[in-house]
Amino acid sequence: MEERPADIEDSEVRRALKAWRIDPVAWEYAPVGFGDYHWTATDTRERRWFVTVADLADKSWYGDGPEAAFSGLRDAMDTAVALRGTEPDGLDFVVAPVPTAEGETVRALGAGHAVSVFPLVSGTPGHFGDTLTPHDSGLVLDLLARLHRTAAPASARVLPPDFATRPQLESALREMSRPWDGIGPYAEPARQLLAVHADALRGRLDEFDRRVRELRASDAPLVVTHGEPHPGNLLRAGERRLLLDWDTVGLAVPERDLWLVADGADGAEGADGASGADGADVLVRYEEATGRKPDPSALALYRLRWALNDVAEFLTWLRAPHGPTPDARQARDALTSTVESLAAAA
């Protein structure tokens, strides 16, 4: 997040690092990403760390409430550590958290947050929305092929295709008759945007349901998936490509990962829920590596799921009290572009 958390002091996070036996001598907030809060730290032995504090209220895919969110986040971080240590060589592209002295991959920070610590890896980070070159697309597909062939750790959860934020989206669609005044500067514009495109959004929800039924009827095998292997979670270190942010790891069909690579490749359609090219030419490399041909309907399902979930999350953000902050403006702009893209493809 660009903004620091309003309810957490830096001193609280620094104290939490004692569980990792880290004594920071250099400490700086890192205004990156969207959803979690990050700091960089250097300890007395000149080791560098990337410290992440998760807002458990924003981890709805793990279940309702902070306890379910913490349990799900812990399972995801445990899974990342297990993947990194997979025998015989491990998945060296997994940037996994560092366990505490007691073996914990994540620790509670107050009632509604959790902290994890990662090694600060040298490299060039990407950004969400970047276009992958054919070379990068190939390298990422190679990583995903390795990941999808890896045996699932015991901590890996099955992740159904449904999206947990759907009730918030449906609630917003039902509650458009009155102005959303007195909440924040972007609430009422969000309502007006939704009112214009409500029929199209309901149609896309119907399409989503149809594609979920098709996927379940196919009985496709589940594999370990990252969940968000987009350029923003990619670190370039020479010819190596590393994957960050494993909080969405879980068991699903491969297309949960593959659509993002296909859409992010040079010349492919955007990852905004619009129908169009499925990047079949890009995915040939994956098919050759795994022997499994990606299913176009499943690719379309997960593309649509991403967009609908984004709409729900941004609406939830803007229907809560907010000010004209950079993060709120980012949510407003992303909501507008995503809703318009969904409607255009309806």
Segments from the language model and where they lie:
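A conserved alpha-helical element in kinase catalytic cores
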Residues: 53-113, 128-129, 134-139, 277
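Protein kinase glycine-rich loop
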Residues: 28-32
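Active-site Asp-x-Gly
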Residues: 224, 235-298, 323-327
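ATP/Mg2+ or Mg2+-diphosphate-binding catalytic cores
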Residues: 268-275, 312-346
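Juxta-kinase regulatory segment immediately upstream of eukaryotic protein kinase catalytic domains
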Residues: 1-27
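A glycine-centered beta->alpha junction motif in the catalytic cores
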Residues: 55-57, 115-129, 152, 177-188, ...
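Active-site acidic catalytic loop and adjacent metal/ATP-binding pocket
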Residues: 34-45, 50-51, 97, 206-258
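A cross-family kinase active-site recognition segment
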Residues: 101, 130-196, 222
